[in-house]
């Protein structure tokens, strides 16, 4: 079994191939093309992504009943108070569904402004957003055991925020190696493999 950790950069699709958009597989050399991503991160999301040739790993890490927590750090437009984080922790109705998110861990990290986050702003909206550089930004964490499409973004939206920067930091006890620059990858160590095999 091969398992690699990648610090997925923004701008890459988590897929084996796509006709029109770059994928994470394009960041890997030919000898690692037999690997596949474990789960997916949105194109504009960065952070911990696992790649493996073990089909059972997906099931073990991704199915909600296995309770493997994924930790995300987000920045969102707007000022979300503690009550919003309490609501996300209890579960919120996800837009476009009749589904209540499962209970999660959610906590506030702090506040900044659009001006403080200029380098992280979506390029197409940069100039428009910088017209109001003092607009508040909320920084927070969400730890989820389920992984619905756009879940973090939808949960934050349900409490009045709009995520513009999102990074996955960990899967279970396995944390992203912060020494990896965006787009870099490495094989898991024996100790790290144990963390995802338990």
Regions found by a protein language model. Give the residues of each.
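Basic, flexible Lys/Arg- and Gly-enriched helix-loop patches that mediate nucleic-acid binding at interfaces
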Residues: 1-198
């Amino acid at each position: 079994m091969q398992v690699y950790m990648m610090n997925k950069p923004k701008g890459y699709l988590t897929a084996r191939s796509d006709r029109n958009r770059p994928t994470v597989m394009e960041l890997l050399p030919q000898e690692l093309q037999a690997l596949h991503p474990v789960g997916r991160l949105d194109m504009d999301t960065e952070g911990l992504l696992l790649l493996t040739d073990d089909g059972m790993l997906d099931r073990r890490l991704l199915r909600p009943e296995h309770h493997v927590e994924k930790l995300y750090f987000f920045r969102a437009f707007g000022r979300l108070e503690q009550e919003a984080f309490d609501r996300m922790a209890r579960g919120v109705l996800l837009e476009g569904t009749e589904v209540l998110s499962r209970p999660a861990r959610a906590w506030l990290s702090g506040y900044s402004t659009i001006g403080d986050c200029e380098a992280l702003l979506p390029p197409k909206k940069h100039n428009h957003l910088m017209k109001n550089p003092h607009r508040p930004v909320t920084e927070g964490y969400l730890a989820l055991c389920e992984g619905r499409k756009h879940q973090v973004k939808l949960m934050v939206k349900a409490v009045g925020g709009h995520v513009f920067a999102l990074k996955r930091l960990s899967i279970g006890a396995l944390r992203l190696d912060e020494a990896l620059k965006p787009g870099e990858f490495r094989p898991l160590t024996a100790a790290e493999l144990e963390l995802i095999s338990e």
